[in-house]
Amino acid sequence: MTTTLQQRSGASSWQAFCEWVTSTNNRLYVGWFGVLMIPTLLAATICFVIAFVAAPPVDIDGIREPVAGSLIYGNNIISGAVVPSSNAIGLHFYPIWEAASLDEWLYNGGPFQLVVFHFLIGIYAYMGREWELSYRLGMRPWICVAYSAPVAAASAVFLVYPFGQGSFSDAMPLGISGTFNYMLVFQAEHNILMHPFHMLGVAGVFGGSLFSAMHGSLVTSSLVRETTETESQNYGYKFGQEEETYNIVAAHGYFGRLIFQYASFNNSRSLHFFLAAWPVVGIWFTALGVSTMAFNLNGFNFNQSILDGQGRVLNTWADVLNRAGLGMEVMHERNAHNFPLDLAAAESTPVALQVPAIG
């Protein structure tokens, strides 16, 4: 009898935990994806803060030239970063127990892998948690679909690009200046500005900003007045009210006359779908572009493509961009013995003039 009661008590405790995890009445929804998200994002955040403040220099290139990224080694908020793991580690999984000592783990940039892997698992779980909450509330699943765009971008720079280049040392550093350095090196090595997927991403981000500003200003300019001249118009809205808070007909008429009739949406649902889809698709293409350039399927090359009647080169902006890329490539290679191959002007000298006969 005692054993039976203990089993029922244990079962009821587990059932209570399951109901709490999946309850939509909590102030913050947890969900089963949240059970995975919370510890992974906490681990990533704690390790990032400690490494950003106090991590020792990391031998990022694997040539015994450590790069300092933490605050206590002289960096500030702008220049500081969690430096990627060493090129000597390559793509190997490098947890703490794989190193001979904690000092070795820190010297080879182990904290970077710890932060990135926990962060990626955390944002994947956050996306799943968005779907889970939508499912529990009977909503459609497009919120997690929209969130998949930044998730794809983070996966591209932290996971796919290192896989394509053969080392986690090529991943994006976790810092402001490190991000800029990553962008400059990416342009130098892959000519990303001439890649059509990057162009689509720029159109998505800037176009989304433009459309968001246009939509917000149109709505704000066509609010239905419910207050006096001396009160804020925001007091004219009550949460959950059934009436429209702005006059979509007036906004449609204004914008249709400002541009042309068919440039304005007359359907609020299709309008908001467009506002969501435009930047999401653009960022998807950017992530896809970074993922293809990870395997050296680079941007277009129009260098020295225009010649005059005598065969002399007429420089274009493509040539200016190429010269800038060469300069960035030189600055990127800190060690002289690893001179970039695409800058070598002379023919390589063979080690052996002829293959020796065997036997």
Curated annotation (Swiss-Prot):
Binding site for a quinone: 215, 264-265
Catalytic activity, as annotated: 2 a plastoquinone + 4 hnu + 2 H2O = 2 a plastoquinol + O2
InterPro entries to which the protein is assigned, alphabetical: D1/D2 (IPR055266), Photo_II_D1/D2_sf (IPR036854), Photo_RC_L/M (IPR000484), Photo_RC_L/M_CS (IPR055265), PSII_D1 (IPR005867)
Chain residues that bind chlorophyll a PD1: 198
Residue numbers binding chlorophyll a ChlzD1: 118
Keyword Flavoprotein listed: no
Site (Tyrosine radical intermediate): 161
Residues reported in the UniProt entry to bind pheophytin a: 126
UniProt subunit comment: PSII is composed of 1 copy each of membrane proteins PsbA, PsbB, PsbC, PsbD, PsbE, PsbF, PsbH, PsbI, PsbJ, PsbK, PsbL, PsbM, PsbT, PsbX, PsbY, PsbZ, Psb30/Ycf12, peripheral proteins PsbO, CyanoQ (PsbQ), PsbU, PsbV and a large number of cofactors. It forms dimeric complexes.
Protein name (Swiss-Prot/TrEMBL): Photosystem II protein D1 3
Origin species: Parasynechococcus marenigrum (strain WH8102)
Gene name linked to the record: psbA3
